[in-house]
Curated annotation (Swiss-Prot):
Family note: Belongs to the complex I subunit 1 family.
Record-given protein name: NADH-ubiquinone oxidoreductase chain 1
Lineage: Eukaryota, Metazoa, Chordata, Craniata, Vertebrata
Main location: mitochondrion
Membrane topology of this protein: Multi-pass membrane protein
GO cellular component: mitochondrial inner membrane
TM stretches of this protein: 2-22, 71-91, 104-124, 148-168, 173-193, 224-244, 255-275, 295-315
Length: 321
């Protein structure tokens, strides 16, 4: 019990530290892509800027609108960060803190619960801009989770199991990125939409909604939403690295698995930042059109194809119930 608590605490601290420096990397990347410096004053080359930002936000007085619902207004960001951090318990590095066989289903279920934090914050703010942003976030998240779920089903047929360890063992000789690149492309775009990142950041369209569902937040509660968002970005890219870029070769679980995953997740995270600097925001109807009229039929077709291939080849790879 004590070992599990210690492992959980270390994991949470490492994730929060990684999130802090991801914000600095993002600001520096955007700065250089826009021909400017970015943060470069606090510490050596601005390395301490995220620490200064965090201290500043948490020292500010938490304020909320007079008409807001205080309990839910404070509970929503806490719930968002708790759900975002709890997802990391299932990442094998090389062993996950929580060892269950239905890892992917639990990850999908916990990520689905994040819509309650968004909706609760928008409703509790008692602001029409926050509520519209929250409703957009809920519709977008639920829509693209359909795509994520179907892609996971296709990959589960190939691995024969619901755990991330099964993905690692299956990719000993070749990556799923090479054999299932259409699924990988749709998965990556869906993770952009799932984490509300550019070009799918309709929930915080500045010209329409000021800042989306967290428009009324300031200080510590706003920082919690910020940490939850970037923790989800790190988690989704780490999950992508494990699912599509699994370690190659025998005995792969013993060869510095954390370094292996980090080396593969880092380019994906940089790609997230590159996309933010390069692409404009979609219209809301284009966002939904992409999911329901493009991704969904293609996912269903690929799922049917892979299921029929697995059955026709003697049931190889089909999960045993």
């Amino acid at each position: 019990m004590l070992v599990m608590l210690t492992s959980t605490l270390i994991l949470v601290l490492m994730v929060l530290l990684a999130v802090a420096f991801l914000t600095m990397v993002e600001r520096k990347t955007l700065g250089y892509m826009q021909l400017r410096k970015g943060p470069n004053v606090v510490g050596f080359m601005g390395l301490l800027q995220p620490i200064a930002d965090g201290v500043k936000l948490f020292l500010k007085e938490p304020v909320w609108p007079t008409a807001a619902s205080p309990a839910l207004f404070i509970a929503a960001p806490i719930m968002a960060l708790t759900l975002a951090l709890s997802l990391w318990m299932f990442i094998p590095m090389p062993q996950s803190i929580s060892t269950i066989n239905l890892t992917l289903l639990v990850i999908l279920a916990i990520s689905s619960l994040s819509v309650y934090a968004s909706l609760g914050s928008g409703w509790a703010s008692n602001s029409k801009y926050a509520l519209i942003g929250a409703l957009r976030a809920v519709a977008q998240t639920i829509s693209y989770e359909v795509s994520l779920g179907l892609i996971l089903l296709c990959l589960i047929i190939l691995t024969g199991g619901f755990s991330l360890q099964a993905f690692i063992y299956t990719q000993e000789h070749t990556w799923f990125l090479l054999s299932s690149w259409p699924l990988a492309a749709m998965w990556f775009v869906s993770t952009l939409a799932e984490t509300n990142r550019t070009p799918f950041d309709l929930t915080e369209g500045e010209s329409e909604l000021v800042s989306g569902f967290n428009v009324e937040y300031a200080g510590g509660p706003f920082a919690l939403f910020f940490l939850a968002e970037y923790s989800n970005i790190l988690f989704m890219n780490t999950l992508t690295a494990i699912m599509f870029l699994g370690p190659l070769g025998p005995n792969n679980l013993n060869i510095l698995p954390i370094i292996n995953v980090m080396m593969k997740a880092t380019p994906l995270i940089i790609l997230f930042l590159w996309i933010r600097a390069s692409y404009p925001r979609f219209r809301y109807d284009q966002l939904m059109h992409l999911m329901w009229k493009n991704f969904l039929p293609l996912n269903l077709a690929l799922f049917t194809l892979q299921l029929s291939l697995a059955v026709s080849l003697g049931g190889a790879g089909v999960p045993q119930m």
